A protein has these predicted regions:
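N-terminal module-boundary/linker segments of secreted carbohydrate-active enzymes
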Residues: 33-44, 114-175
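Predominantly extracytoplasmic/ectodomain segments of secreted and cell-surface proteins
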Residues: 20-115, 124-130
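Short, well-structured beta-strand/strand-turn elements
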Residues: 92-96, 241-256
Length: 538
């Protein structure tokens, strides 16, 4: 760790608590001999004298194993340090004095954050002393304390989120979340905010960097995604296609660093979760009494919700997400299954015209193809059954966007050259003798390309994420914590993937939508269990 031993600063008699008027730890510079004199008159404590500090009134996270405090300063300071006031709580500060044993002011702020420089602080009472270290990060900090073991069921927790001068302290609850990823060492979590310490009575809070919500998801990011950018990039581009008032619109995201019961857990992606009930209500309050929402899922990894087996794929099913009161009802899916089972193409097209929200299905497929989403058809797809006067119409929306941008899974290859199967849309395109579906597909494709998908957009976002991960010092800390080789983020492979997908898809989609003669063999294979087939045999 970097130590700048050139100067000292002290403060005496801290008597402050979060939210009250506070006094700074750092006072005028003192000579090193004064610190030595304080040491000589006291015994070194076997335990840290302070494990709770605030930076500018905002809680700091504490790595108990390494005795290191972390403070969030954001990434907008440049070389100039912001005013920093470290304080202890009233209970901790009784009889305790604190000072820096290193002067961070001798370093540039941005360099100190980027390189993860640590600065010693000296804590002492009349009889004892101890040292600790302080590290400043550019990312938000999430600090969770739970007395019970955290598993899939909710347990009460104390939650703190800090970003520069913004801070949140709240009661809440936490549980592990995820499918196959829950078996990894680095797992995801869901945090919900509550009024009471027992994790009851959910409430909304202002989340630093994210806005107001009652919950957040902390994604460990796919273990195979060494860039740590795929999920965030996908949602950012999808946000260019959806309005906030539109059902199942793009989710807000931000990187953060997580501390759990005093243990540093590395970099996570904080994600705004869907409240399915609220999303349904965006289409009109009357929908809450008529509609149902299901999520496709691999049954072995389902989330414990009521689930119906997919009649066309034994390993997968449809989980019920709304409504959750009363007996589980899967009858709204009957017309959808009947459509998928229709053997006559002409009859299939007539049924589809009556029961499928065509623009929803086509936009879903266009995003599927451009982003290379290989885990969003037989898994992780919302199927929304919208009932009007006894007639059901189906809309499709994304549940997550992580297995994307050429990410490998199940030895399927990098997917750069593959058309990703969505059997419903594949057949709509293949059986479209009149050409209207193909023409509309081309229109939506051009709209998505124009609004949300070109290499310049991708490159700009990837550059921003690399800045956040690298210049915050967080990527290197995550690599050290999880013993990976990914000490620096660049995301170049995502930019390369975007360029390859554009080159591969633009011409076939243009020709298909224009009614030109084109080899459509890539649409012919509709096995639900297949993830894709090459667009070109070259």
């Amino acid at each position: 760790m970097f130590l700048a031993m050139a100067a000292l600063a002290c403060a005496i008699g801290l008597t402050v608590k979060y939210g009250s008027t506070y006094r700074p730890v750092v006072e005028p510079v003192r000579e090193i001999e004064e610190i030595w004199a304080l040491e000589d008159a006291r015994e070194e404590s076997e335990e840290p004298l302070v494990t709770r500090l605030f930076c500018n009134g905002v809680p700091m996270a504490y790595d108990a194993e390494n005795n290191v405090f972390y403070g969030s300063l954001g990434l907008d300071n440049g070389a100039q340090w912001p005013e920093i006031k470290l304080t202890a709580s009233e209970e901790t500060a009784k009889g305790l004095s604190l000072c820096f044993a290193d002067d961070y002011g001798f370093d540039d702020c941005d360099a100190a954050i980027r390189e993860g420089y640590s600065y010693q602080i000296f804590a002492y009472t009349d009889t004892a002393y101890s040292y600790a270290e302080v590290v400043f990060t550019g990312l938000p900090l999430v600090n969770v304390t739970a007395e019970q073991t955290i598993e899939r069921e909710d347990v009460p927790a104390q939650i703190e989120i800090a970003l520069a001068a913004e801070g949140l302290q709240t009661n809440g609850r936490i549980h592990k979340r995820g499918g196959a990823s829950i078996l990894n060492d680095k797992v995801g979590y869901k945090l919900e905010f509550t009024r009471t310490t027992d994790g009851k009575k959910k409430i909304y809070r202002e989340i630093p960097g994210m806005g107001t919500d009652s919950q957040v998801i902390l994604l460990p990011m796919n273990a195979l995604d060494t860039t740590m950018m795929r999920d965030r990039l996908s949602w950012a581009l999808y946000a260019r296609l959806t309005r906030r008032d539109e059902p199942f619109s793009a989710r807000k995201t931000q990187y953060c660093e997580l501390f759990l019961n005093g243990e540093y857990r590395g970099v996570y992606l904080m994600l705004e979760p869907f409240s399915v009930r609220q999303e349904v209500a965006k289409a009109g309050e009357e929908r809450l009494t008529t509609d149902s929402v299901y999520r496709t899922a691999v049954i072995s990894l389902s989330h414990g919700r009521p689930c119906m087996e997919d009649p066309y794929s034994a390993a997968t099913g449809f989980e019920l997400y709304y409504p959750m009161d009363g007996e589980p009802d899967f009858s709204p899916l009957a017309d959808y299954f009947a459509l998928l089972g229709e053997t006559d193409d002409a009859a299939f097209m007539r049924r589809a015209a009556q029961s499928i929200d065509l623009d929803s299905a086509l936009r879903y497929d266009v995003v599927l193809q451009l982003f290379g989403l290989t885990d969003n058809v037989i898994n992780n797809m919302y199927t929304w059954a919208q009932n009007s006067r006894g007639h059901t119409r189906y809309r499709f929306d994304f549940w997550d966007l992580d297995v994307s941008w050429g990410l490998k899974r199940d030895e399927i290859g990098e997917m750069h050259e593959n058309w990703v199967f969505f059997p419903l849309v594949d057949r709509l395109l293949r059986a479209d003798e009149e050409g209207g579906v193909r023409q509309r597909y081309g229109e939506i494709y051009r709209e998505v390309r124009e609004k949300a998908f070109d290499t310049e957009m991708v490159e700009a976002l990837v550059g921003q994420y690399a800045h956040e991960l690298n210049d915050s010092g967080a990527m290197a800390r995550n690599a050290e914590r999880w013993e990976t080789e990914n000490y620096a983020a660049d995301g170049y492979e995502l930019v390369a993937f975007a360029a390859e997908r554009i080159a591969l898809l633009d011409e076939p989609v243009r020709a298909m939508s224009a009614g030109e003669e084109i080899d459509l063999r890539f649409l012919e294979k509709t096995n639900y269990d297949d993830k894709g087939t090459p667009l070109s045999e070259e």
